Amino acid sequence: MSRKHIASEALLKNIQVPQGDKTYEKILDAGLALFVEFGLRRTTMEDVATRAGIGRATAYRRFADKDQLIQVVILRECQQQLAMIESDLEKVDDGLERVLESFVLAVTRAHRHPLLKRLLTSEPETLLPLLTQRLWQMMGFFRIYLAGLLQVEQDNGAIRQQPMEPM
């Protein structure tokens, strides 16, 4: 697996995102915008549907409930952030340096992300349960991403061989 596709592969193993469904994308975009603006608690599915320019029933046909929408929005944001990190890493030649830089970039981007900043300032009590209980897929996503990144660097001889299975 090339470095360019690690994030996409990790995401696809954890959640099925319909490709080319413009309405689905509009719902995700509206959800993200409203979650950043008003927080998770204050945003309703009706708010999201209105912002997306669709009916509430259409939103519910694509997402069973707000929790599912939250999960998909966050997973999509993770995938997009990791894709940007992978793009930045293309400029780094040394494999070990690439692994270290990936961690630095991930932490930096996380601290600057508007949704994470919103949750930390207005709903900190929801963040830990969200990440550990409701977004268990995200842990799998990061595990697959990290294992893929390390495997590529092992294959390139940049870091020593270790089995990735424990990850």
Regions found by a protein language model. Name each.
Residues 72, 86-115:
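Hydrophobic alpha-helical connector segments
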Residues 53-63:
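Short hydrophobic/aromatic patch on the recognition helix
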Residues 1-14, 108, 140-156:
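C-terminal peripheral helix-coil segments that are non-catalytic and often amphipathic
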Residues 20, 28, 70, 74, ...:
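Amphipathic, non-transmembrane alpha-helical scaffold segments
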Residues 87, 120-129:
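Short linear capping/connector segments at secondary-structure termini
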Residues 1-38, 42-51, 67-71:
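Basic, helix-initiating cap at the start of DNA-binding domains
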Residues 37-41, 92, 113, 156:
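Short coil/turn segments at alpha/beta junctions that flank glycine-rich nucleotide-binding fingerprints
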Residues 79-82, 127-156, 161-166:
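Amphipathic alpha-helical packing segments from all-alpha helical-bundle domains
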